[in-house]
Amino acid sequence: MAVENEGVLLVLSSPSGAGKTTILERLLERSTNLVRSVSMTTRKPRPGEINGKDYFFVTKKEFHELCEAGQMLEYARVFENFYGIPKSFIEQNLSSGISVLLSIDWQGAFHLFELMREKVISVFILPPSMEELRLRLQKRNSDSASEIEHRLAEAQKEMSKRDKYDYVVINDDIDKSVEEISSILDKERLKRSGV
């Protein structure tokens, strides 16, 4: 049985371009008892991203040293870079009754399921169609045509994992998707508090 005031991990996964980041930002605006986990990555920052807010940007050497020291809850290689979740951030928030929102790929989610399934609420976000996903990726203007094709191929693989998640949300309307995931979080918090 979960401690009454213990937080939960809300895991959001999706193919690149499905709207996960926008949904994450809107969920954080709505809730005072929810924080975003800041992941660590070896990839280069995108325009407008801030170190310590969007990600902790580190070198591959620094990343591997932290992993070897056991300071990552989970980590995975995605394309040519590494992503990981610092362990202490999660533990401190959960024990304080604050839920943590994680935006991670399916590999990281599956690892968390193994480590702490009883604390995880998982949601896979789908685009309304592959054509819509292509359009969203093109609108970003951050990837070449070949990178977009690679992301679309990876999206097919990622979407095949959706049945392992607690919930699946089709993001064809951002406001409805945010409302649906917010309701899921409220329902799961109530269930886990024994109310």
Swiss-Prot record:
Residues binding ATP: 14-21
Reactions catalysed: GMP + ATP = GDP + ADP
GO molecular function terms noted in the UniProt entry: ATP binding; guanylate kinase activity
Enzyme Commission identifier(s): 2.7.4.8
Compartments where found: Cytoplasm
Superkingdom of the organism of origin: Bacteria
S-S bridge residues: none
InterPro entries hit by this protein: GK/Ca_channel_bsu, Guanylate_kin-like_dom, Guanylate_kinase, Guanylate_kinase_CS, P-loop_NTPase
A single cellular component GO annotation: cytosol
HAMAP family for the chain: Guanylate_kinase
Function text: Essential for recycling GMP and indirectly, cGMP.
Name of this protein: Guanylate kinase
Originating species: Wolbachia sp. subsp. Brugia malayi (strain TRS)
